[in-house]
Amino acid sequence: MYLGIHVSSSGGIQNSITNGEKYGVNSIQIMPTAPMRWATKLITDEQIDIFLDTLERSSIKKILIHGIYLTNLAREDKQLFHLGKMGLVVYLDFAERVAKGIKERKIDSEILGVCFHPGSQKELSYEDSLERISYGMQWVLDEVKGNQKLLIETTAGTGGNLGRN
């Protein structure tokens, strides 16, 4: 059985692993960067090596990466739409590289993918918002080749939030 928790990665992404272990769980959900800042720079190989070193010595088996909270792929604003896509590219790239490191090092752990809130309907119609989200997701998947999943987190659907069904 797997039991997990969303943990902080403050002070370095490797801290998410030790924070999860403090709670006695074997699965964690993490945000590799600050949740309320645009993630536009790829996570370095050195950061990933430190993360893998920590993971190798841990009891964490499952890791889900959560996208930043600023992502709204339903936005019509081209700059905000692009920043949202790039944040997902950064996280999906991180997931791919960590999964590769897990395989190479034969670590008994797994990256489950990147989940994110799809966004809120603001400027566009409901149908156009869904089309925009679909286009944004496909763009991200085309940018980052690999096997990691891009997962939409369901929402309550309040305030124009999309992803409720």
Task: Show which residues each predicted segment covers.
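N-terminal pre-domain/capping segments
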Residues: M1-G67, T71, D77-V90
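Active-site acidic/histidine proton-transfer and metal-coordination neighborhood
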Residues: R57, L73-N165
